[in-house]
Amino acid sequence: MMGVSRHRAIGVDTENVTRSPASMEMAEHFCSRNEIAQLRSELDENRQSERLLDFWTLKEAYVKARRMGLSIPLNQISLSLPGSRGIEVAFDGSVHDHGDNWAFWMLRPSADHKSAVCVARSPGTTLAFAVRSAIPLVMHQMITSAITRKSE
């Protein structure tokens, strides 16, 4: 998966959902307190693992957009996935950022993969987001059903 942006920072991360499931032990290392509470409220281990992978993928996209690598403490980024389609983000003061500065999308490009995209926002501008399947110099087509969640 590749992201293209004109004049804006962009980060993209893709994870294979068929890998061994993520665990709560793993969550203790990179999740915020709020995220851990959300994970614990999930009764089903499969749902916990799925949500944990959502958090990881979104955080990786953000870190890539910021171009600071893992020097950003991931447990200081707090994500919430309200309803069935929303994404909200908040940052601890040590991250020196604000959730309104970023737009997020989650996608399901295939049955075995989930992806996240993070793009810097500018006040007073609207972001256009499109997903395409492409084989360079051969074909490309829009994909509309891949987007599963987005920030407002």
Predicted regions and their residues:
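Core catalytic alpha/beta fold that binds nucleotide/phospho-ligands
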Residues: 1-152
